Amino acid sequence: MKIHEYQGKELLKQFGVTVPRGIPAFSVDEAVAAAEKLGGPVWVVKAQIHAGGRGKGGGVKLGRSIDEVRQLSSEILGMQLVTHQTGPQGQKVRRLLIEEGADIKKEYYVGIVTDRGTQRVCVMASSEGGMDIEEVAAHSPEKILKVFVDPAAGLTDAEAAELARGIGVPEASVGKAAAEFQKLYKAYWDTDASLAEINPLILTGSGDIIALDAKFNFDSNALFRHPEIVAYRDLDEEDPAEIEASKFDLAYIQLDGNIGCLVNGAGLAMATMDTIKLFGGEPANFLDVGGGATAEKVTEAFKIMLKNKSVKAILVNIFGGIMRCDVIAEGVITACKAVNLNVPLVVRMKGTNEELGKKMLAESGLPIISADTMAEAATKVVAAVK
């Protein structure tokens, strides 16, 4: 689960991280009132969407008067903000953060993720904070320092100070920077986050260290422990199809292709998408029905896939382990009739009750294309859309 920047800063503040004064706004009038309450002479008007690259996309602007704040707020609020993370369709801006300006002497980056290779939390920091951090990661990875944290000890004073010195924080401010790193680590750990990031973390002219941005992702499997985090959820920022899918315990992510995929198991789903691409097609979605799929779940999965008007064919790829192929076959038949399926459907089933499932499909009277291998299934579904 993702949250907005202003919510991330509220969270950081609870853990003692230094953040600028700021007020969220949902209208132009609220933005102006926020600027007046904060006082000048400079304000930052920031679009609030669940995507990075807002500055480059025109979603972060400086206002040097109340009138300019009003003008910028009216331009940004309601705009379709396009960044490298939103895709070409962009994301509508429904909220703003009005923030006091900062005296920026130097920008740094600090982020925390779980490293699966070492099975430890990785704290990353760089002297090259700001809008181009992704280019730094791609082209100058040596500029990103990493510390792999012992979970029993946490991020120690020595590790935090070494990281601060390593990215060039002036010695007089190393203690402050190290403390901010440790507070960010505690926020990450205590909230079951999967990502915690400050970009930029700035050094001011007076030597203070301030978090000018905040980005958090949370492990959805741990949200039952954090109702205060769940309260931050903004459904307007989520794909309606993904929200609908979650109601039926379906893992669904919409993509840009035209071949719908219905698969059981995340690994098989990814392999199926790879195979489609290998044979010249483009998957329209990731959809994992899981090991306990019912006819109802399969029907809902078809409905969700077909709401995407880009879908020109569907591939069902099932391995019957816990899931029985006859149950999937029943669901496919029910779904085809319920949605009046009018796009080509290719079905591959292997495993438990495979022959029974194939027999049910063959006797259904529906124009279902069968396949025995993944390569055959991918070949047939790609041919169906050409």
Swiss-Prot record:
The UniProt family comment states:
Belongs to the succinate/malate CoA ligase beta subunit family.
> Which HAMAP family does the record match to this protein?
Succ_CoA_beta
| Subunit details | Heterotetramer of two alpha and two beta subunits.
Q: Which UniProt keywords apply?
A: ATP-binding, Ligase, Magnesium, Metal-binding, Nucleotide-binding, Tricarboxylic acid cycle
Gene that specifies this protein: sucC
Q: Which GO terms describe its biological process?
A: succinyl-CoA metabolic process; tricarboxylic acid cycle
Cofactor entry: Mg(2+)
- Cofactor remark from the record: Binds 1 Mg(2+) ion per subunit.
Identification of the protein by name = Succinate--CoA ligase [ADP-forming] subunit beta
Q: Which residues bind substrate?
A: 264, 321-323
Report which reactions are catalysed by this protein: succinate + ATP + CoA = succinyl-CoA + ADP + phosphate; GTP + succinate + CoA = succinyl-CoA + GDP + phosphate
- The keyword ATP-binding belongs to this UniProt entry's keyword annotation: yes
**Involved pathway(s):** Carbohydrate metabolism; tricarboxylic acid cycle; succinate from succinyl-CoA (ligase route): step 1/1
InterPro entries, from UniProt?
ATP-grasp, ATP-grasp_succ-CoA_synth-type, ATP_grasp_subdomain_1, Succ-CoA_synthase_bsu_CS, SUCC_ACL_C, Succ_CoA_ligase-like_bsu, Succinyl-CoA_synth-like
According to its record, what are the GO cellular component terms?
A: cytosol; succinate-CoA ligase complex
Q: Name one Pfam family in it.
A: ATP-grasp_2
Could you tell me which residue ranges the ATP-grasp domain spans? 9-244
Q: Give the enzyme's EC designation.
A: 6.2.1.5
Q: Which Gene3D superfamilies match?
A: ATP-grasp fold, A domain, ATP-grasp fold, B domain, Succinyl-CoA synthetase domains
- What is the enzyme's main class? ligase
